[in-house]
Design a protein with these regions (language model features):
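Conserved ABC ATPase "signature" region
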Residues: 89-104
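A short, surface-exposed alpha-helical micro-motif characterized by mixed small hydrophobic
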Residues: 175-177
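Conserved ABC ATPase signature
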Residues: 108-112, 116
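Catalytic Walker B motif of ABC-type/P-loop ATPase nucleotide-binding domains
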Residues: 133-136
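C-terminal boundary and immediately downstream tail of ABC-type ATPase nucleotide-binding domains
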Residues: 197-217
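H-loop/switch region of ABC-family ATPase nucleotide-binding domains
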Residues: 169-170
Length: 217
């Protein structure tokens, strides 16, 4: 699928200006960049949460699922929170088991820890099939064991459903583990894109090299 090029301006300052982009189906495209590079704004615009300056659709005819950085559970059980995005108890049980929160199914979601809430939110978004699944820092609150389980589930979902996954992440290691393609943002602009391992192992742009060196890659 392809996005149109677009810009986003805040208080007279252009914070994001991107060209037309391809987001392949059946693949995970990771978006990396320093804080303030425009990653989350990009995600919100694609998801329709915010509007680009052009005030026209960035994607057309595409169903989009969006998982924000921070999720706020409803005042109901963990299982019922997950079922708000699809009435399929068997699927909910499968997802909760995969992320090791099955024992919390009947517990009030308001009592979950940050990591447990993140796992519940990921289960909830994966209840439905989408053409494009946008995940904004989905594992930040998780420990490493849960992160690896979540990554496995995301990869399996992508492969089984053929959806395109756009993964916003601050973790270069995470991008290396599960991403097929990589987009690198710097100060609101796309400075590099390509096959993930190729970009990480042999970046073509100086700003990409500096970013990777700063994060110790």
């Amino acid at each position: 699928m392809k996005t149109t090029g677009f810009t986003k301006t805040y208080n007279g300052r252009v914070v994001l200006s991107l060209p037309e982009l391809s987001i392949p189906k059946g693949q995970i495209t990771a978006v990396i960049g320093a804080n303030g590079s425009g990653k989350s704004t990009f995600a919100k615009i694609l998801a329709g949460i915010e509007r680009a300056d052009e005030k026209k659709p960035i994607l057309s005819g595409v169903s989009v699922g969006y998982l924000p950085q921070k999720s706020f559970p409803f005042r109901m059980s963990t299982e019922k929170n997950i079922l708000t995005n699809g009435n399929d108890p068997a699927r909910a049980a499968e997802l909760m088991k995969a992320l090791d929160i099955g024992m919390l199914a009947g517990q009030s979601a308001k009592k979950l820890s940050g990591g447990e809430t993140a796992r519940m939110a990921l289960c909830r978004i994966l209840m439905r099939r989408y053409d494009l699944l946008i995940l904004d820092e989905p594992t930040t609150a998780m420990d490493m064991e849960s992160t690896l389980s979540a990554e496995k589930l995301i990869r399996e979902t992508c492969g089984e459903t053929g959806c395109a996954v756009l993964l916003i992440t601050h973790s270069i290691s995470q991008a290396r583990r599960i991403a097929d393609r990589l987009l690198v943002l710097h100060r609101g602009k796309l400075i590099e894109q390509g096959e993930c391992q190729q970009v990480l192992n042999a970046p073509a742009q100086e700003e990409t090299r500096r970013f990777l060196e700063f994060y110790g890659l």
